[in-house]
Each structure stands twice: as C-alpha cells, then as structure tokens.
C-alpha cells in the first residue's frame, strides 16, 4: 500500500462513498466533489496557460458531478500562490470564474493563501437529486454497460508528456 492509499484509508471510516467520484449527502440530497491540482505535479507553467490550468481543475470536478447524475449548483474555490506569481494566479482565477459562471454555478466561498508553488482546489456541490438517481461507481456490477463519448487517456498522456 503506497502512502496515498494509507492516507485515504486513514479517513475511510467505513464510508461507502470513498473511492467514488462524489459523495451523496442524504440530509441535503446533494452530491459533492472536490479536486486539487498543484504546480509541478499536475501542471508545468512552461507548458500550460492560465486557461488550460483553470480548465483542468474545472473539468475534473464538473465531470465527477455529472457522471454521478448530478448538476453542479455551488462552488468553493481555494488558491495558494507565491507573490511573484500573483498576476498568473489572478488570470487562472478569472478563467475559472468564467467557466463557473458560464455553467450557472454560484460561487459560495473559498480561501486564498500564500505558498511556494501554485495550489488550486475546487469543490462543487450539486442541485438536489433523489438518491435513486445517483450513479456511483461503488454500485457498479459485472455486465453493466459503459458508454464513452470522447477519447480517453489524454490526461495521462499529457502528464507523461510533461516529464
């Protein structure tokens, strides 16, 4: 078991949603998903524009909610960056804000801090959805059908191309 798996296991507490793209909050009947990306791990500033960085963060969260049957409604955005990269951080934030607004998602909060490298985190919360309509990987069974509408594997290919 690698360190990432150990950290995840540390917080599992028999939670049936760990490992799925989203968690279903039965009290509010909403899906929630969060992802983070960091400079020099998920993107290289020499190879990615502010728009591409924002797009990567947005799409990873947006697709998690949609693939689980939900429609994003609210967003929380966190960004950490060094002062010398503040113009780039602002550009990434503006691009992300435009994607969020275009999809009629309301930004309800977040945080900004300083750090050595750029760190971005986005959390999306869906509109209300009935539990019976939620699609979770943990509920998949042998012989379930999977439909792909676009090419897959480009995220990994892009990552391998960076280093």
Kindly give the residue locations of the regions a language model identified.
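Helix-biased detector of long, well-ordered alpha-helical tracts
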Residues: 1-163
């Amino acid at each position: 078991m690698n360190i990432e798996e150990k950290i995840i296991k540390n917080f599992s507490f028999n939670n049936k949603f760990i490992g799925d793209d989203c968690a279903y909050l039965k009290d509010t009947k909403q899906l929630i998903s969060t992802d983070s990306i960091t400079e020099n791990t998920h993107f290289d500033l020499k190879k990615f524009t502010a728009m591409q960085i924002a797009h990567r963060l947005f799409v990873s969260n947006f697709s998690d909610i949609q693939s689980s049957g939900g429609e994003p409604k609210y967003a929380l955005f966190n960004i950490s960056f060094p002062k010398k990269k503040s113009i780039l951080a602002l550009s990434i934030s503006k691009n992300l804000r435009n994607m969020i607004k275009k999809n009629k998602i309301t930004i309800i909060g977040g945080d900004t801090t300083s750090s050595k490298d750029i760190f971005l985190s986005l959390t999306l919360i869906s509109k209300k959805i009935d539990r019976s309509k939620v699609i979770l990987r943990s509920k998949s069974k042998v012989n379930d059908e999977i439909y792909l509408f676009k090419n897959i594997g480009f995220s990994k290919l892009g990552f391998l191309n960076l280093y």
